[in-house]
């Protein structure tokens, strides 16, 4: 299917970056994204990393190209800084997001306390604090995290706006309205790119919100993606690649750009 890709939204770790592979980056994938940028497409990295951790990753893995925008911490929207520095908030989304989270954590103390008590009593997971506030969890295994998220799903029925973002053994507490998909939707609104011209690729739980078809009409995932991600991509009539990591992203981009170049 020949489609016009104007905005590319990619996860970072596990999608573009294959930590245990050599090379870590797929050269053909990076070259294609760079070529699309030269042709006028915009590329954003949509990640659970903070701005600082993403910048260190771009440096550590020697990315030869730069994203046009970054969506960080599974919620915030940044553009290149116009007044020194590398990045600045794009619009007032980040402020609105911070306010919503402050109000949520103030009103959801009983839910959060119950979750932390469950974690401390019944698991070996570690609670991560940002100052005095609990920000998230690190489990000892994915099976342990499965058990924790099952409990969270039970208790959050009392306060549905209390939610979480999960990636392997890591979990971040968050407002249900703010996630990778919502951040992508805000960016697309700000730069006036419709859903029909957005390609998105990811591999794990926290990527589902940008791969379920609501915010990107061209969702995709590499072969190393977990089954719930593959299911979401298939349900959205997207593309599940046969190759892993960046090679899979490259394969998916070619699928949408050139039709079925790589036969499934």
Where in this protein do the model-derived segments appear?
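A generic structural motif
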Residues: 38-42, 160-161, 216
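Short, flexible loop segments at the rims of nucleotide/cofactor-binding pockets, characterized by
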Residues: 19-23, 48-49, 176-177
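Active-site phosphate-binding/coordination module
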Residues: 25-124
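Anion (oxyanion) recognition and catalysis
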Residues: 37-38, 156, 234
């Amino acid at each position: 299917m020949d489609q016009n890709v104007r905005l590319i939204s990619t996860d970072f770790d596990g999608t573009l970056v294959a930590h245990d592979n050599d090379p870590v980056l797929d050269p053909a994938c990076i070259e294609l994204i760079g070529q699309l940028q030269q042709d006028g497409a915009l590329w954003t990295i949509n990640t659970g990393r903070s701005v600082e951790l993403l910048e260190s990753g771009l440096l550590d893995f020697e990315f030869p190209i730069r994203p046009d925008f970054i969506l960080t911490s599974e919620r915030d929207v940044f553009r290149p800084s116009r007044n020194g520095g590398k990045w600045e908030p794009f619009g007032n989304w980040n402020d609105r997001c911070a306010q919503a989270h402050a109000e949520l954590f103030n009103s959801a103390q009983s839910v959060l306390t119950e979750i932390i008590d469950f974690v401390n009593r019944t698991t070996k997971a570690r609670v991560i604090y940002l100052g005095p506030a609990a920000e998230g969890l690190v489990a000892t295994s994915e099976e342990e995290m499965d058990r924790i998220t099952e409990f969270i799903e039970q208790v959050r029925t009392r306060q549905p706006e209390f939610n979480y973002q999960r990636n392997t053994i890591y979990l971040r507490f968050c407002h249900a309205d703010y996630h990778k998909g919502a951040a992508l939707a805000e960016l697309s609104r700000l730069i006036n790119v419709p859903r029909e011209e957005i390609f998105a690729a990811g591999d794990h739980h926290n990527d589902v919100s940008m791969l379920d078809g609501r915010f990107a009409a061209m969702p995709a995932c590499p072969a190393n993606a977990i089954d719930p991600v593959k299911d979401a991509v298939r349900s959205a009539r997207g593309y599940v690649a046969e190759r892993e990591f960046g090679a899979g992203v490259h394969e998916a981009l070619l699928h949408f750009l050139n039709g079925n170049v790589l036969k499934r």
